[in-house]
From Swiss-Prot:
It is a multi-pass membrane protein. The lineage of its organism: Eukaryota, Viridiplantae, Streptophyta, Embryophyta, Tracheophyta. This is Ammonium transporter 1 member 2. InterPro entries: Ammonium/urea_transptr, Ammonium_transpt, Ammonium_transpt_CS, NH4_transpt_AmtB-like_dom. GO terms for cellular component: plasma membrane. GO terms for molecular function: ammonium channel activity. It comes from Arabidopsis thaliana. GO terms for biological process: methylammonium transport; response to nematode. Pfam families: Ammonium_transp. It is found in: Membrane. The modification Phosphothreonine is found at residue 472. Keywords: Ammonia transport, Membrane, Phosphoprotein, Transmembrane, Transmembrane helix, Transport. PROSITE patterns: AMMONIUM_TRANSP. The gene is AMT1-2. NCBIfam families: amt (TIGR00836). Its main location: membrane.
Length: 514
């Protein structure tokens, strides 16, 4: 702030008042004072806007960093022969998602004025005149794009190790350009039919569905889309034996899984607290130093407690069920707790977040047992984790949302959590959200995946799947075990029959790893 232009000059003001005692001088002095106060007010408004915009940009950077977390998590969860493929698909999700969200997705999500189903204002397509609108800036687009590609990244994990590259390109563009934006319009836009932020206060059940940072909008959308794709494709070769018993196809690197988990954990502090969009906003004038910045801190705490509780619950639960301590299960449990708390992170107490994480862990364990029983194959447990825990998170918000926090964030006297004495209206809205998300994603992504399947554009051949896509589709392995694995010095046929060196001898022999 330029203090020279916002500070009254005592010399100038003294000269005006001492030169004459008539009303003209008094008016001049008053005009001078008012102009200075106006300048100060404008500067403070600019500063507030700049701080809020910087906060949103920083949050967008954190959410985007989650893409690296997704990439590492996916890479570690698949077999070594498909590492390059899955990392390339994560890059593709971000790149294709950026173009489709820029051209169509952002307008479908937040184009206003519009109807309750989908945004349609022309100025939002390709950001044609978006920044010229009052209160809008490019930072909001960047933040929402980071959310959109997160949903696409979730889906890629469910269909890993058996999907053609062109299918990734098609589904990623469609999901980020149409399917996800429509859902985000319903629940986050000021015009959305079920949004808790509707400008006309014509709210679903008098409350709207509270999905603060996207347990449903992001996690359920990505998880259900992945479920559709995995069901159409079927399990990976070797995932179940001839008698139908489950065969573990373990990922090749627990180190990458842990690295990816910590990167996602770090990014979640932009995902959840960043969803306030602004930070310089006061709440209760009777409480000094209390405002939106306090709610941001509380949201970070509830996010942390839910994830950590889910991780610990999964650790001991899986020890009892499986007889060993499994770091992969703990990482997935942690992420399940984060996915669940994302809906109500801003409107619940810290103690309630512990309840959320505890239940989320068992939701994930239960859905994994069900998936095994139904012979459903999801290499990253994405549908169970994001879809199942995301649905629990929406229900949790309907049960535990606190009245004071709901009224701070959403205007008016709203219904709040059932277990907090607020009745069942909010819970009803949350259940409606679960139903419509499952229905919408199923009727859009299901036919897309089925159409790709019928056109032979979805699943790779059995030969490619057995050999590994790194070799057959991407020109080499992600790891060079020794000089003989350097494809730059050997013809392709030398490697066609082997994917990974065995550990039984110092000289690798041709083997197929499933």
């Amino acid at each position: 702030m330029d203090t020279a232009t916002t500070t009254c000059s005592a010399v100038d003001l003294s000269a005006l008042l001492s030169s004459s005692s008539n009303s003209t001088s008094s008016l001049a002095a008053a005009t001078f004072l008012c102009s200075q106060i106006s300048n100060i007010s404008n500067k403070l408004s600019d500063t507030t806007y700049a701080v809020d915009n910087t906060y949103l940009l920083f949050s967008a950077y954190l959410v985007f960093a989650m893409q690296l977390g997704f990439a590492m998590l996916c890479a570690g969860s698949v077999r070594a022969k498909n590492t390059m493929n899955i990392m390339l698909t994560n890059v593709l999700d971000a790149a294709a998602g950026a173009i489709s969200y820029y051209l169509f997705g952002f307008a479908f999500a937040f184009g206003t004025p519009s109807n309750g189903f989908i945004g349609r204002h022309h100025s939002f397509f390709a950001l044609s005149s978006y920044p010229e609108r009052p209160g809008s800036d490019f930072s909001f687009f960047l933040y929402q794009w980071a959310f959109a590609i997160a949903a696409a990244g979730i889906t890629s994990g469910s269909i890993a190790e058996r999907t053609q590259f062109v299918a990734y390109l098609i589904y990623s563009t469609f999901l980020t350009g149409f399917v996800y934006p429509t859902v985000s319009h319903w629940f986050w836009s000021s015009d959305g039919w079920a949004s808790a932020s509707r400008s006309d206060n014509n709210l679903l059940f008098g409350s709207g569905a509270i999905d603060f940072a996207g347990s449903g909008v992001v996690h359920m959308v990505g998880g259900i889309a992945g479920l559709c794709g995995a069901l159409v494709e079927g399990p990976r070769i070797g995932r179940f034996d001839r008698s139908g018993r489950s065969v573990a196809l373990r990922g090749h690197s627990a180190s990458l899984v842990v690295l990816g988990t910590f990167l996602l954990w770090f990014g979640w502090y932009g995902f959840n607290p960043g969803s306030f969009l602004t930070i310089l906003k006061g709440y209760d004038k009777s409480r000094p130093y209390y405002g939106q910045w306090s709610a941001v801190g509380r949201t970070a705490v509830t996010t942390t407690l839910s994830g950590c509780t889910a991780a610990l619950t999964t650790l001991f639960s899986k020890r009892l069920l499986a007889g060993h301590w499994n770091v992969i299960d703990v990482c997935n449990g942690l992420l399940g707790g984060f996915a669940a708390i994302t809906s109500g992170c801003a409107v619940v107490e810290p103690w309630a977040a512990i309840v959320c994480g505890f239940v989320a862990s068992w939701v994930l364990i239960g859905f994994n047992l069900l998936a095994k029983k139904l012979k459903y194959d999801d290499p990253l447990e994405a549908a169970q984790l994001h879809g199942g825990c995301g649905a629990w998170g929406l229900i949790f918000t309907g049960l535990f949302a606190r009245k004071e926090y709901v009224n701070e964030i959403y205007s008016g006297d709203r219904p709040y959590g059932l277990f907090m004495g607020g009745g069942g209206k909010l819970l009803a809205a949350q259940i409606v959200q679960i139903i419509v998300i499952v229905g919408w994603v199923t009727v859009t992504m299901g036919p897309l995946f089925y159409g790709l399947h019928k056109m032979n554009l979805l699943r790779i051949s059995a030969e490619d799947e057995m050999a590994g896509m790194d070799m057959t589709r991407h020109g080499g392995f992600a790891y060079a075990y020794n000089d003989e694995d350097d494809v730059s010095t050997k013809p392709w046929g030398h490697f066609a029959g082997r994917v990974e060196p065995t550990s039984r001898s110092s000289t690798p022999t041709p083997t197929l790893t499933v």
